């Protein structure tokens, strides 16, 4: 009889084991299927967002490129370059002219253009030529605008605005340095008191300021790139500092000056980048913050519900790994809301109600980070859980109170997250929060009494047998306590906000700029060993490239061409741990960026400049080119570097206007091949 009973018991255990195994396999299969569906849904959303953004940027680049492949647009914006008089090509508008002009020369062969005015009109002069809204010299800088836009644009408005600020500030310092050098040597290298050593020392010092201060990436890139370009022209005795002749209403600023062109083209590129994130569909970080907050609340709800259900189970099963996966996903969502909060400052500048909205969500984010810390304790408890007889006693006593506390806590959390949206806690909302907090306190008391009662049955409150149960109970209670404290602070938000100064250092944009400037140029950091190594590692290649540009002539080298040092300024590694693969990707991006557009343009050149087919083909090529490689930039983390480099360095060839003369076209192609070399 005993043997039969033992056999039956063994069969029951085997059957139970097989049943558990089957159940676990079924749960794993169901979990995998659910995960696959969720993953596909997220991938589909990301694909649509990335594709839409790529198409929008491509559309902006195509519209911006109209003056390049449309002669009418080029004349409207930059004026009439030349005209045919008696089968002879005569130059009309010079590179430094803009606006409507009259010809006070002898005839059409001897053109002398001046600005139109009432006196000339009264004398019988008629408008002769339109020289554009911008001087013709800006036409050569048109690809620079596209390159700036490509290095500036990001997935959201706030991040793009931040990049734009970095770009403009870096370029501004480069322009400021050239004005300083022009003050010392008004004619540049052709000045009587000019000495090359001073110019080299200035260049090295400016590079040191950018690199040793460890400024933001875009600040360093655009600042150093603009510096080497401006300084090369300054040190060229044939050109010197091109201050310009077409004066503006701003003192010391000429519309056709090189410093003005560099500054304005960078600003235009930044404006295009920002506009791409606003129209046709706004991609504001501040609007994502509330969605992220609700997503986090939903994730916390699922995690704590699953944790309590698993805790109240009768045996270990694979559900705990599913819970751990959700915890990891929640951490990613919390990082996202932190990034959106930081970037949203550059959209709102804490003006109006946005200061309060950001303050409320910053407090929410802090509370959620405290919750994230609690999750580590819960994970540890679930891993150690034994499901023995002591555990079953805890489940019977604590299961109900835990679930009730979870429900009340999530109800309070959801209310508070929604109350943050409008940046104001009304008296009615304050009263609701206080009622929710009181309910949480009541449920905490019930749970504490239940735990005290069941733990008292053991000889010790802390023992190996009940340690996981104690830890789990503590974590649930601590989670509720953290959110309770945050909710109480939220209820008193309005009174605290009124006591806060309206223009304190945290919300004043000028104070923030001053603080950043001070931190950048802190001497102890700039002259630290790490900063000096970083400076030498990046400045030496740029200075070597600059020396080649200064002195090398012949073969593939063009003296005083900024291609080599400017490219190095945009490509050097700003991360100390940059890998060989990353540098190889940059090299591939630059190479393909120069060669692929050449192949495209070689086909377009078969059509004459006034051909409608050429107009459509050139515009379509720009659109497809930027749609494809911008999509690579957004969609692929591995190949993003190549995508952005191809887009940024391809503009010089794609945005080349049509040349009716074979000699000019051939010279342009030769120049592009030298750039590749």
What does each of the following model-derived ranges do?
Residues 296-512:
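Cytosolic, long alpha-helical scaffolding segments
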């Amino acid at each position: 009889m005993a043997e039969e009973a033992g056999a039956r018991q063994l069969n029951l255990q085997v059957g139970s084991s097989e049943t558990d195994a089957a159940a676990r396999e079924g749960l794993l299969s169901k979990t995998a299927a659910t995960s696959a569906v969720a993953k596909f849904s997220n991938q589909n959303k990301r694909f649509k967002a990335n594709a839409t953004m790529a198409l929008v940027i491509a559309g902006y680049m195509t519209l911006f490129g109209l003056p390049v492949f449309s002669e009418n647009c080029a004349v409207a914006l930059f004026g009439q370059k030349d005209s045919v008089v008696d089968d002879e090509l005569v130059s009309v508008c010079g590179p430094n002219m803009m606006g409507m002009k009259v010809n006070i020369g002898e005839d059409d062969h001897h053109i002398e253009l001046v600005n139109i005015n009432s006196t000339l009109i009264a004398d019988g002069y008629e408008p002769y030529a339109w020289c554009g809204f911008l001087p013709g010299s800006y036409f050569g800088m048109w690809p620079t605008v596209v390159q700036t836009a490509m290095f500036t644009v990001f997935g959201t408005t706030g991040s793009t605005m931040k990049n734009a600020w970095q770009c403009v500030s870096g370029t501004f310092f480069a322009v400021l340095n050239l004005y300083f050098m022009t003050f010392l040597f008004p004619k540049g290298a052709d000045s009587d008191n000019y000495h090359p050593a001073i110019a080299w020392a200035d260049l090295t010092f400016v590079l040191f300021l950018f690199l040793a201060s460890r400024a933001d990436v875009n600040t360093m890139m655009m600042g150093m790139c603009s510096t080497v370009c401006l300084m090369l022209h300054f040190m060229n005795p044939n050109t010197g500092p091109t201050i310009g002749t077409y004066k503006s209403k701003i003192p010391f600023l000429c519309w056709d000056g090189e410093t003005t062109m560099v500054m304005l083209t960078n600003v235009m590129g930044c404006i295009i980048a920002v506009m791409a994130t606003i129209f046709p569909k706004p991609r504001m970080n501040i609007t994502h913050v509330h969605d992220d907050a609700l997503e986090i609340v939903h994730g916390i709800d699922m995690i704590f519900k699953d944790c309590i259900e698993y805790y109240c189970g009768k045996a270990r099963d694979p559900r705990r790994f599913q819970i751990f996966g959700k915890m990891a996903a929640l951490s990613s969502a919390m990082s996202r809301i932190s990034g959106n909060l930081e970037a949203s400052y550059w959209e709102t500048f804490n003006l109006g109600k946005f200061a309060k909205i950001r303050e409320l969500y910053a407090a929410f984010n802090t509370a959620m980070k405290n919750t994230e810390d609690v999750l580590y304790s819960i994970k540890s408890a679930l891993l150690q859980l034994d499901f023995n007889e002591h555990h079953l006693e805890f489940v019977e006593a604590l299961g109900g109170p835990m679930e009730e506390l979870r429900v009340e806590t999530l109800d309070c959390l959801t209310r508070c997250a929604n109350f943050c949206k409008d940046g104001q806690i009304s008296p009615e909302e304050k009263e609701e929060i206080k009622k929710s907090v009181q309910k949480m306190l009541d449920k905490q008391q019930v749970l504490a009494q239940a735990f005290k009662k069941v733990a008292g049955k053991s000889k010790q409150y802390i023992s190996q047998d009940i340690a996981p149960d104690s830890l789990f109970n503590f974590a649930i209670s601590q989670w509720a306590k953290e959110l309770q404290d945050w909710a109480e602070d939220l209820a008193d938000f309005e009174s605290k906000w009124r006591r806060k100064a309206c223009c304190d250092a945290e919300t004043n944009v000028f104070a923030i700029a001053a603080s950043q400037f001070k931190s950048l140029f802190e001497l102890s950091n700039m002259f630290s060993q790490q900063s000096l190594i970083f400076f030498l590692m990046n400045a030496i290649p740029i200075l070597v490239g600059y020396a080649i540009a200064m002195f090398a002539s012949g073969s593939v080298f063009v003296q005083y061409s900024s291609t080599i040092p400017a490219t190095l300024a945009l490509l050097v590694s700003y991360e100390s741990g940059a890998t060989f693969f990353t540098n190889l990707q940059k090299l591939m991006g630059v190479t393909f960026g120069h060669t692929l557009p050449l192949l495209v343009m070689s086909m377009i050149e078969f059509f004459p400049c006034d051909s409608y087919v050429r107009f459509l083909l050139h515009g379509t090529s720009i659109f497809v080119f930027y749609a494809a490689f911008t999509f690579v930039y957004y969609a692929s983390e591995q190949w993003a570097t190549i995508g952005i480099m191809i887009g940024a360095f391809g503009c010089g060839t794609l945005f080349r206007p049509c040349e009716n003369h074979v000699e000019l076209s051939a010279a342009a192609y030769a120049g592009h091949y030298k750039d590749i070399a």
